[in-house]
Amino acid sequence: MTRLPVVAAIVTSELGVLVARRNDGKPPWTFIAGEIEPGEEPADAAVREVSEETGLRIRATGMIGRRVHPHTGREMVYLAARPTHGTEAVVGDEDELAELRWVDLAQADELMGGTIFEHVHNYLEKTLKARDSE
């Protein structure tokens, strides 16, 4: 049976990029992500996952990239996203997530052990740098 692709929402705001600490520790810190359901568009899956896991309402703003994840072998779709109604994020699925944080790129790199997908890293460099220069 083919496994469904996974969407990762790269949510940025004036506070930085949203990351989550997983309860199972695999990996300890990650972006908000989940399986794309059959017939679901990646952008709709990103909106659904972020809402379920953080309570945030977001809008997907574009594709960052795709790849087969080097550790899981899963097809990954990375989407840029922005909050539409505030930035207060709370853990919505305590079985899956332990903590949410808005962080800068250096903190995200440190928390994720330098494993951020190159296309995502480049997007965050550009996006967060533009934010910092405003």
Enumerate the predicted regions with their spans.
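Conserved N-terminal beta-strand and adjoining loop/helix that marks the start
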Residues: 1-17, 35, 64
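Structural detector for helix-capping/boundary residues
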Residues: 34, 48, 61, 103-106
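Conserved Nudix-box catalytic region and its N-terminal flanking loop in Nudix hydrolases
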Residues: 12-52, 56
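A short coil-to-beta-strand element that immediately follows conserved catalytic motifs
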Residues: 57-65
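Active-site-adjacent beta-strand/loop module that shapes the phosphate/pyrophosphate-binding cleft
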Residues: 67-90, 101-107, 116-127
